[in-house]
Regions:
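Conserved, well-ordered alpha-helix/loop/beta-strand core segments that scaffold catalytic motifs
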Residues: 1-19
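Short amphipathic alpha-helical signal-transduction/dimerization elements
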Residues: 198, 247, 322-329, 333
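A short acidic/glycine-rich loop-to-helix N-cap element
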Residues: 307-316
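Short, flexible loop/turn segments with low-complexity composition
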Residues: 335-345
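Beta-lactam-recognizing serine transpeptidase/beta-lactamase-like catalytic domain environment
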Residues: 19-66, 71-306, 343-354
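A helicase ATPase "motif cassette" and its flanking acidic/Ser/Thr-rich regulatory loops
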Residues: 3, 117, 321
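Glycine-rich phosphate/pyrophosphate-binding loops
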Residues: 203-204, 332, 336
Length: 354
């Protein structure tokens, strides 16, 4: 109920057509809460479930945008091509094939570390790293992280998403795919990428039912979720630290939760036109992350469909993430961080009474 209530308020505040949110236990893979709502601007009753009763978190594929950049970075780290402090000379645009890719904000050529590239959500920097990784290895990491296949969570109509075989990529695909366009994922698939990082690099199959209780009150626990290692513990730890920087000083500063360290990433992507090539002027805005970063317990994804106020995930989706994460941490009684939270420090004075 709390997740849906917050999502409704955030969808209304952003004047979005709708929204989706999921909360997952990173230890078990259990989905603790999920919500799908329609906004007041949609051509359906406000705050209703989707008109055709789809659970969009599981059944609808969307282009994730920059939340998917973490997979390119993960692959490059795992292959030993870069480390978090590797420096790249990054311009604000780069031609790949017949398309020019640009960063969201114009800037002079700058020397950025890989951590900076992720924190600033640089398209050019990410594509540069992806080109060194190569399409075959990039595709392998996308699939190992769970893209292109169903999670097999057991929900009817679950989508597998859209991920073309590298043999079918065109000359611009090494630019589009690494930054989360020209692919389609469900919200659950995207959330599970971050849960995998939180879980030390081990992918765990999501579970929506932990146990059943029969008419006589006998409880039967469901089998433990299947697992597989995707990246090393060392790579996962590096990504954890880098994703914290996104929230501390990058595009995700509005995702801060007082008292807790947050790791996560913003995402913004234009929606494809229906039934034909090209893109509309509508956007999907998102934030996906986990907490407490030093001892992850919960992962949360918030996605807003075509927000009418601002388009960027760091502006319109991150605040909803923070509210839902804060509520989930409280309800699950997760202890505050043992290290400094991501709130800026303020000077204060105090008088001692003897």
């Amino acid at each position: 109920y709390e997740v849906e209530r917050v999502l409704i308020e955030e969808v209304d505040s952003a004047r979005a057509k709708g929204g989706m949110a999921v909360v997952m236990d990173t230890y078990t893979g259990d989905v603790l809460a999920l919500a799908n709502v329609e906004g007041a601007v949609a051509d359906v009753p406000a705050h209703s479930a989707p008109a055709d009763s789809r659970n969009r978190v599981l059944t609808d594929a969307y282009q994730p945008g920059s939340t998917a950049k973490v997979i390119t970075i993960a692959g490059a780290l795992e292959e030993g091509l870069v480390n978090p402090n590797s420096v790249f000379h990054v311009a604000d645009s780069l031609k790949v094939g017949d398309h020019v890719f640009s960063d969201n904000e114009k800037h002079a050529p700058v020397d950025w570390t890989v951590t900076d590239i992720l924190a600033e959500s640089s398209n050019v920097g990410t594509i540069t790293i992806a080109k060194s990784l190569g399409k075959t290895r990039l595709d392998s990491y996308l699939r190992t992280f769970g893209f292109g296949v169903k999670t097999e969570i057991g929900f009817p109509g679950e989508a597998s998403g859209i991920l073309l075989d590298p043999k079918r990529w065109d000359s611009t695909s090494i630019g589009t795919v690494p930054i989360g366009t020209a692919i389609g994922v469900t919200v659950l698939q995207m959330l599970n990428v971050y849960a995998t990082i939180a879980n030390g690099g081990v992918w765990r199959q999501p579970r929506i039912v932990a146990a059943t209780v029969d008419a006589e009150g006998v409880r039967t626990d469901m089998p433990t979720s299947a697992t597989r290692r995707v990246i090393s513990t060392s790579t996962a730890r590096q990504l954890n630290d880098m994703l914290r920087e996104v929230v501390k000083r990058g595009t995700g500063t509005r995702a801060v939760v007082p008292g807790y360290s947050i790791a996560g990433k913003t995402g913004t992507a234009r929606k494809p036109l229906e039934g034909r090539r090209g893109y509309s002027n509508d956007y999907m805005a998102s934030f996906v992350g986990f907490a407490p970063a030093e001892r992850p317990r919960l992962a949360v994804a918030v996605v807003l469909d075509d927000p009418g106020t601002e388009i960027y995930g760091g502006v319109v989706a991150a605040p909803g993430f923070a509210r839902i994460m804060q509520a989930a941490l409280r309800l699950e009684r997760v202890a505050p961080s043992t290290i400094t939270s991501d709130l800026p420090l303020k000077k204060a004075t105090a008088t001692l009474t003897r």
